[in-house]
Amino acid sequence: MSNWYSRKFARVLSIERLLWMALICAGVFMYFRYKTVPSLEQDSIVVIDSAGVQHKLSELTSGITVVHFYASWCGPCLKELPEIQTFMNTPLGKQINFVFITEDREDVANVYRERYGFNIYRLNKLKDANVYSIPVSYLLNENHEVVKSDLGEWNWNKKEFNDEIKTLIQ
């Protein structure tokens, strides 16, 4: 009787270990999918402008550029948009090209174009650009190289951020 019980107990422990391993693997997967900044494949990302014309992202990134992925249903994104607009209106911000990308419908994107005056482009799904969490922003130098990327809100008026931009401009 005790032999049967110990085999059953060992089997339960094995199943428990497998479940823990599965949970750990799922956690690692979720972390890397949703909490890390994906690489920006500028030549493979095709966006749509307000006229319905398709563009490769690499065609839109001239000079120093900020590429910003957002959505209208994202609270942190909506909180950040006025801060970006304020930064864009500074002398430093006027020297940077901004590209906003969303998966919102065209009518929703138009509301934000009109409200903020942003260059907003659309993707059918942000996951087509390997973006699974938003907001996510990329700062590109004049050679189209990503020099800064972050998931979440940026502090657009932070001195360190402004110094980083000034370094790129010089």
Roles of regions detected by a PLM:
Residues 44-65:
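A short beta-strand-turn-helix
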Residues 63-65, 69-73, 133:
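Short pre-active-site segment immediately N-terminal to redox-active cysteine/selenocysteine motifs
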Residues 103-107:
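Short, polar loop motifs at secondary-structure junctions
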Residues 90-95, 116:
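Short helix-capping segments at alpha-helix termini
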Residues 69-86:
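Conserved redox-active cysteine motifs that mediate thiol-disulfide chemistry
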Residues 99, 110-143:
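Short, internal strand/loop/helix patches
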Residues 142-170:
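Thiol-/selenol-based redox modules, centered on thioredoxin-like
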Residues 1-48, 170:
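N-terminal targeting signals for export/organelle localization
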